[in-house]
């Protein structure tokens, strides 16, 4: 079951409302006393429905969770879909100046985004659904810029999020700043991170291999449960990320 809401994000949208998709696991309305972990996701329009997806293809996450009977609530919030590429600011921890068509530079507003997720979105979900609201059952995930935000959330807000899945995280950033953030992060040993990158992404983004390896090595030096993958034939799109769900979701649900 997927419920849809429209809620405001005042610091970015003013009175404009964005869509929030909430997946409730199979049996939610039968087992009335059972509570569930929650996975918060970026780019919510791309998570469940092809009709809503930015490029016409979603992750198909609801179908996967139904088929696997995964006992997990998912709260997926829509990103800034406007032509001004405001998403790149909302999802960036650092000043971001991408190459080519994306313009820039973009002001970093990742902390504002996470403050809203923690202080507004999480209480909204916890007050309406049977969640397990503690840190140990609060997860976060995304791809591309949402993958970068997943890393940021675990590194800077490890007191709220215990587990994350970062698929093809955007790494054409100031990699030195990200590495410094990783080194400075105080992560508890029960932190779980899944991070992957597509083999084909390395072919057309010359910086990506070194940045992925460098960040993965630093993350590996932390006392956490880390799973990194190089995806054969993997690309930077939803069709490819959908195929990684059998790896990412079981990692998030490890020993739950």
Q: How does the language model describe each region?
A:
Residues 1-256:
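Non-catalytic cap/lid and distal C-terminal segments of serine-dependent acyl enzymes
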């Amino acid at each position: 079951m997927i419920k849809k809401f429209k809620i405001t994000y005042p610091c970015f949208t003013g009175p404009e409302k964005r869509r929030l998709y909430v997946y409730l696991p199979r049996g939610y309305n039968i087992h009335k006393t059972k509570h569930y972990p929650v996975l918060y996701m970026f780019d919510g329009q791309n998570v469940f429905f092809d009709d809503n997806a930015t490029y016409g293809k979603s992750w198909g996450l609801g179908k996967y969770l139904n088929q696997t009977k995964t006992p997990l609530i998912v709260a997926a919030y829509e990103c800034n879909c406007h032509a001004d590429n405001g998403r790149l600011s909302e999802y960036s921890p650092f000043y971001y100046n991408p190459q080519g068509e994306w313009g820039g530079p973009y002001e970093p507003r990742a902390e504002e985004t996470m403050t809203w997720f923690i202080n507004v979105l999480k209480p909204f979900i916890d007050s309406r659904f049977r969640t397990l609201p503690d840190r140990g059952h609060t997860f976060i995930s995304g791809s591309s810029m949402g993958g970068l935000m997943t890393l940021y959330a675990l590194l800077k807000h490890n007191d709220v999020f215990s587990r994350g899945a970062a698929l093809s995280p955007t790494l054409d950033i100031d990699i030195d700043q990200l590495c410094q953030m990783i080194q400075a992060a105080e992560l508890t040993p029960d932190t779980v991170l899944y991070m992957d990158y597509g083999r084909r992404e390395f072919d057309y983004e010359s910086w990506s291999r070194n940045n992925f390896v460098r960040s993965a090595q630093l993350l590996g030096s932390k006392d956490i449960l880390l799973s990194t993958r190089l995806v054969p034939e993997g690309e930077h799109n939803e069709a490819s990320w959908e195929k990684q769900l059998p790896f990412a979701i079981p990692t998030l649900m490890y020993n739950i």
